[in-house]
Amino acid sequence: MGRKWNNIKEKKASKDKNTSRVYAKFGREIYVAAKQGEPDPESNQALKVVLERAKTYSVPRAIVDRAIEKAKGGAEENFDVLRYEGFGPSGSMVIVETLTNNVNRTASDVRAAFGKNGGNMGVSGSVAYMFDATAIFAFEGKTADDILELMMEADIDVRDILEEEESVIIYAEPEQFHAVQETLKEAGITDFSVAELVMLAQNEVTLSDEDVQQFEKMIDALEDLEDVQQVYHNVEL
């Protein structure tokens, strides 16, 4: 899973350079999670997970508070959680996760981003079966053996624990996100370089240099869309 970890790390580094866009996307996601349940993360698991993820991107407290207050205030802005699937150059596969208050606009924008950059939007299920929903954590200061022992003591059977570039990486089931993180926190691990819920490709493909350029242009076009929250793919970059 080393290459997959590198892809996630590079994607996060790229996002870190676009902080205002990242903050806006998290603001929307926090608002939706708070509005769909209780605005208190202690009683709203979905909100708690979003807030933990937001911490790894250093989302300012003011943005978090504003989104939660907006949800508390009974704002009538409603968003749909929609997934689009498609293909890029040479059969590469892409999943696009969105939060939208205008389904027609979002579908049109996503289709255009694919079509104008050598790709095409597929039907629901055409790509997702080649990805696994995964919780991933990365942090420093421990060894893989330390963490394996910790997880065993907590009776949490994660998918994999690796060591790379001074980081320990944990791959777990999505529903284990909270249990894994709480176990790590109880052991004094509170600084995560990555704490994410992602769609992880089961297999990665390698593209030609020319196709990589076109593929990256397509991914940039998708990620630039206001309604797009996450873009996942199976290309080794």
Curated annotation (Swiss-Prot):
Cellular compartments per GO CC: cytosol
Provide this UniProt record's keywords sorted from A to Z.
Cytoplasm, DNA-binding, Transcription, Transcription regulation
InterPro entries recorded: Integrase-like_N, TACO1_YebC-like_2nd/3rd_dom, TACO1_YebC_N, Transcrip_reg_TACO1-like, Transcrip_reg_TACO1-like_dom3, Transcrip_reg_TACO1_YeeN, YebC-like
* Localization annotation: Cytoplasm
Record field: transmembrane: none
The disulfide bonds in this chain are none
Task: Tell me the Pfam families matching this sequence.
Answer: TACO1_YebC_N (PF20772), Transcrip_reg (PF01709)
Lineage, top-rank taxon, reads Bacteria
Q: Which family does it belong to?
A: Belongs to the TACO1 family. YeeN subfamily.
The identity of this protein, by name, is: Probable transcriptional regulatory protein Exig_1693
